[in-house]
Amino acid sequence: MSKIGKCILNPNEINLILNINSQNANEIIDIAENLAKEFEQIPATKMRDFYDYVLRIDEKNENWYKELVLLKPKLAYNYGKETNRRKKEALEKLAGTFSEIIDKIDNDLNKFKNFKTFFEALVAYHKIYAKSQ
């Protein structure tokens, strides 16, 4: 299976994201802000579309993880159709990073909920740094 992009987070950062608690909350916020800067070339509306897709996943549905995994081809599609070099590079980073996070969630509902919390912070910071709306 081909993978688009390389994860720009280290394993410890991914572990923090998927295991948010009161002791590491400030680190999570820093990670979200730093990633938002990395993804500044992605239009805010596109980032919001990805976030909305994740929000629509029903945690009570036994197939929630399958729906989450389908975010990978959605990211790949957006990467593939992008013609602007800078936006494409940012989408490549996003696809690689989220692919790695999704793999680490591995059907663990609590980790998924933590990812959604992190993604909310990322989208909030991204709105500040996004180059185009």
Curated annotation (Swiss-Prot):
GO terms for molecular function, please?
Answer: RNA binding
Q: Which GO terms describe its biological process?
A: defense response to virus
Question: In its keyword annotation, does this UniProt entry include RNA-binding?
Answer: yes
On the tree of life, the source organism's domain of life is Archaea
Asked if the keyword Signal belongs to this entry, the reply reads no
Alphabetized Pfam families for the sequence? Csm2_III-A (PF03750)
Keyword terms, alphabetized: Antiviral defense, RNA-binding
**CDD domains xrefs:** Csm2_III-A
**What else does UniProt say about it?**
Encoded in a type III-A CRISPR locus.
Q: What task does this protein carry out?
A: CRISPR (clustered regularly interspaced short palindromic repeat) is an adaptive immune system that provides protection against mobile genetic elements (viruses, transposable elements and conjugative plasmids). CRISPR clusters contain spacers, sequences complementary to antecedent mobile elements, and target invading nucleic acids. CRISPR clusters are transcribed and processed into CRISPR RNA (crRNA).
Q: How does it assemble?
A: Part of the Csm effector complex that includes Cas10, Csm2, Csm3, Csm4 and Csm5.
Family label? Belongs to the CRISPR-associated Csm2 family.
User: What name does the UniProt record give this protein?
Assistant: CRISPR system Cms protein Csm2
As recorded in Swiss-Prot or TrEMBL, the protein's gene is named csm2
